[in-house]
Amino acid sequence: VQGFPTIVFADASGKPFGGFVGGRSKDDVMKAMQDALKNKEALNAAEANVAKATTDEAKVAALMEVLKLAPQEYVDNFYGDVKAEIKKLDKDDKSGLKAADAHADQLKKEQKDVQDYLAGKLTDKTTPAEALQVVKAYPDRDKLLPETQQDLLMMEFGTYLNSTGDVDGAVLILDKVAELMPGTEAGQRAPRIKAGILANKDQIKTQIEAAKKAQSK
């Protein structure tokens, strides 16, 4: 569940084929339902092609189409059998599925390592300046996956801005986030944050100075 309400359209076996998150008007709900039913028809056709496939290569291609049409947030829980079959048949990983799963596993490990590191260093009494040094001291940052490096840079951005009030210096960190991997969520979010803080530069500086004065009392 990603938000309220979360609506899922599923078949009789409970396998999702569409849905949406958040409140919608009656017309939008009907459209979402129609779109989901069209997707279900496409899924049925793709699954039929799997059954018709006469070679491993053709079967992998058909199975990949099933994965493409499946709601991505439910793939691991409800289409795991499809992924497993692709991995079994696709010996040379031409689909890239094995590499993608290995990348995802590595990313999860690195994110947990970062969380554990921060949990052991930061407390509710840690100042932004101290937190900045903790984040910057994370070992071997340049050897991490780009997504993990972006997470650390976003933390560095927040702690740097809150400890120094230096908006211009902070946006340079956001630039690094965007340059590192533009297509990720962080890479897309960084330019929007940059535009927002530059548009409200004086107000942000005032708020940070007020917060620093309050902390020093």
What are the language-model segments listed below?
Residues K26-T55, Y79, K201-I208:
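Pro/Ala/Gly-rich low-complexity, hydrophilic intrinsically disordered segments
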Residues Q2-L43:
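Non-catalytic, surface beta->alpha helical segment in thiol-disulfide oxidoreductase systems
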Residues A53-K217:
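Oxidative protein folding and maturation machinery
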Residues G14-K15, N39, A48, K52, ...:
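A sequence-level detector of short, solvent-exposed, charge-rich linear segments
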